[in-house]
Amino acid sequence: MKNCEYQQIDPRALRTPSSRTSSTLPCGRKGSQRLRRKWEVFPGKNRFYCDGRIMLARQCGVLPLTIGLIFITSVLFFTFDCPFLVDHLTVFIPVIGGVLFIFVVISLLQTSFTDPGILPRALPDEAADIEKQIDNSGSSTYRPPPRTKEILINDQVVKLKYCFTCKMFRPPRTSHCSLCDNCVERFDHHCPWVGNCVGKRNYRFFYAFIVSLSFLTSFIFGCVITHLTLRSQGGNGFIQAIQDSPASVVELVICFFSIWSILGLSGFHTYLVASNLTTNEDIKGSWSSKRGEESGNPYTYNNIFTNCCVVLCGPMPPSLIDRRGFVPPEDAPQTVTSDAELPAFMAKNDTNMCAQGTKELLESMANSTVIQSTCAPGKPKTAPVTQESLLNTVSITVSPPSKPPSNGCSGRQARRPIDVPCSQRGLKRAALHTHKPMLRLPSPLYSLSDSPLILSDAPDMGFIPLN
């Protein structure tokens, strides 16, 4: 009589059809795929141009309006006002206007096209580690663990919040922009006029833009008034001067309605720079004096000149998203599958619960079941089963649903039904209609510690539900 040969199956080695297909692709086919750059798979809501060299927010429709107003006003000024002022005043007027115009355009483009300081999102492994740390730090109650951390900056407690989108704790002074869907370092605000967020890497360009635009607008506004005043002094009157130079009226209207907001914005950001604050912190009142002396700004140097140098003249931090870098090819095979690829019974992490349920099952089976010990044809040999013999002979494995096995013993697992008393057969049949994992106890003599778990739902076998 020849005993059946069994092959142990490692449930971690199971693969879904999709993962098996992707891992067995020929090398030539993978090598023929074009390498993609990181900006092509960037998760944020940004637009990239010139092969990732230029980045803008998706809602950048106001940026053309900003550029258009600057260009229209400047072109009208250099075309209709500068010739008259050069003849009656000095040739330095167009030179000064040209320098200011170039400075405004360059600073605007740098603000719009520069990475504001976007932080890359956490990788799956990093996110899993952070979630594990959060779960371990939680209490034994049903309340969820806190999603905040506290750190000390200049002897002052600063709270770090968890970003559910980027799956990480935000560094100090970092905030998540809802329009760009990115976490930005030293987040100031999202400016639709420049079509980008204003943060750590482009704040100096933004400040230079609004200050230079204030000077340019004030300069054009003063030159236009001077032009119309000189024309009206010739005896024709102010109305005639407007009729002689209608473009000056357009410039006057644009500058009049924009100069107040631009000057106010420049003054507000000058105060922020001198205090080493951000617009986001000022609006929220994070370091307001109303909260007491202990809630003062921990980032200030208590010196206006030092704060200005740190904010505007500090070293330019590098971009962390590497938008023009290549996405690494996924050539390395995955040796360990994720929980999504494993059966539901094996995806559980609570091993204590599984061990406890198996122990109770074995104790109940020791008092009510008899297992057939061989698979050779003929009269089956039965023997009473004790708890010790079950612990040494039971092999529990997990396998996908398959057809009923044959009675052959060559290299296949021989399965035999379990002789169950009639009083329990009704319970076993009722359990077949439930959506619970089932256990089948085959006959090979293996220890429980060396054999993996396998699920089977063959209709002709005896099953016991796992409660």
Curated annotation (Swiss-Prot):
Residues 81-88, 226-247 are lumenal. Residues 161-211 form the DHHC domain. It comes from the Eukaryota. It holds the Pfam family DHHC. GO terms for cellular component: endoplasmic reticulum; Golgi apparatus; Golgi membrane. Residues 1-59, 110-204, 269-467 are cytoplasmic. The chain crosses the membrane at residues 60-80, 89-109, 205-225, 248-268. Keywords: Acyltransferase, Golgi apparatus, Lipoprotein, Membrane, Palmitate, Phosphoprotein, Transferase, Transmembrane, Transmembrane helix. It is a multi-pass membrane protein. Its EC number is 2.3.1.225. It catalyses: L-cysteinyl-[protein] + hexadecanoyl-CoA = S-hexadecanoyl-L-cysteinyl-[protein] + CoA. The active site is at C191. GO terms for molecular function: palmitoyltransferase activity; protein-cysteine S-palmitoyltransferase activity. One of its GO terms (biological process) is negative regulation of innate immune response. It is an enzyme of class 2 (transferase). It is found in: Golgi apparatus membrane. Belongs to the DHHC palmitoyltransferase family. ERF2/ZDHHC9 subfamily. Palmitoyltransferase that catalyzes the addition of palmitate onto various protein substrates, such as CGAS, HRAS and LCK. The DHHC domain is required for palmitoyltransferase activity. This is Palmitoyltransferase ZDHHC18-A. It comes from Danio rerio. The lineage of its organism: Eukaryota, Metazoa, Chordata, Craniata, Vertebrata.
